[in-house]
Amino acid sequence: METSSNLSSMVRLNIGGKKFCTTIDTLTIREPDSMLAAMFSGRHAMCQESKKGYVFIDRDGKHFRHILNWLRDGVIPSLSDPDCSELLREADYYQLLGLKDGIKDSRKEVGEVEAELTRIDIIKCIQTERVRFRGVNLSGIDLSKLDLSLVDFSYACLRNVFFSRTNLQCAKFRNADAEGSIFHNAILRECEFTSANLRGALLAGTNLQSANLQDACLVGCSFCGADLRTAHLQNADLTNANLEGANLEGANLKGAKLSNANFKGANLQRAYLRHVNLREAHMEGANLGGANMTGAIR
């Protein structure tokens, strides 16, 4: 039988519509400096749903069970690269530093070869006028929040690199292997990604205006809310990519593969979609005003 103290320590959470039940101890002990610990420390009044007492948090609840399991037992889950990238994004939002470090360490362990440079090495290099990392292996390192504009990463191995909030304007990623990397909220205006491998990469919230992604592998990428205005996506493989809410106004998707791609709520005004197969793409709520749809399969 549960005591009144046990009942009072229980917390009911509604994370983007998914319901969870846990305890205050779980939310506060392992990661005491996290946003969740701050929310349930008793220092703040919590707004609950009137009937059942759920605390609502406006986030995607898909991976929150992994967050709870981490807070309970400290075990890093084994996930695919896209799911791992999404979990890392959630850990970043909730300020779960231990979980972030654990995910990054686990991704480094699965890498075949260690990175040839460290974050400190990169910071030293970018003090010079012209920086090139062509063909260099930088897999798994944290390059978040740096100014790497104009840097040449062509042919580099950038698997699972953390580029969150990094300024990469006009950087070159030609033929680079950036599978599973995280570019969340990065500045990628006018970047060149021709023939790059970005399979499973997280590009949600990025600024990709006028970026060149021709012939790139974008399978399973997340572009949710990204700015892709006038981007070049000719012959890119967007199979299973998520572009929900993205802005693709004036983008060129000639010859792009869009099987099972999600364009729900996306802005495709004046986009170039000639002879593109949209039959297996999800277009609910997409704005196609003025788009060139000549020969498109719908």
From Swiss-Prot:
Query: What Pfam family is a match for this entry?
Result: Pentapeptide
Question: Where is each BTB domain found?
Answer: 9-80
| Subunit composition and interactions | Interacts with FH1.
Q: Which SUPFAM superfamilies would you find in this protein's record?
A: Pentapeptide repeat-like, POZ domain
InterPro entries (alphabetical) = 5peptide_repeat, BTB/POZ_dom, Pentapeptide-BTB/POZ_domain, SKP1/BTB/POZ_sf, T1-type_BTB
Q: Does the keyword Chaperone apply?
A: no
Pentapeptide repeat domain sequence ranges? 129-165, 166-203, 216-255, 256-295
| Cysteine disulfide partners in this protein | none
Keywords (A to Z) from UniProt: Repeat, Ubl conjugation pathway
GO BP: protein homooligomerization; protein ubiquitination
Organism from which the protein derives: Arabidopsis thaliana (Mouse-ear cress)
Comment block on domains: The BTB/POZ domain mediates the interaction with some component of ubiquitin ligase complexes.
Its biological function? May act as a substrate-specific adapter of an E3 ubiquitin-protein ligase complex (CUL3-RBX1-BTB) which mediates the ubiquitination and subsequent proteasomal degradation of target proteins.
What is the protein name for this chain? FH protein interacting protein FIP2
Q: Which SMART domains match?
A: BTB (SM00225)
Its annotated pathway reads: Protein modification; protein ubiquitination
Tissues and organs where the protein is expressed, per its UniProt entry: Expressed in all tissues but preferentially in roots and flowers.
**Gene3D superfamilies in the record:** E3 ubiquitin-protein ligase SopA (2.160.20.80), Potassium Channel Kv1.1, Chain A (3.30.710.10)
What is the gene name?
FIP2
Do the record's keywords include Repressor?
A: no
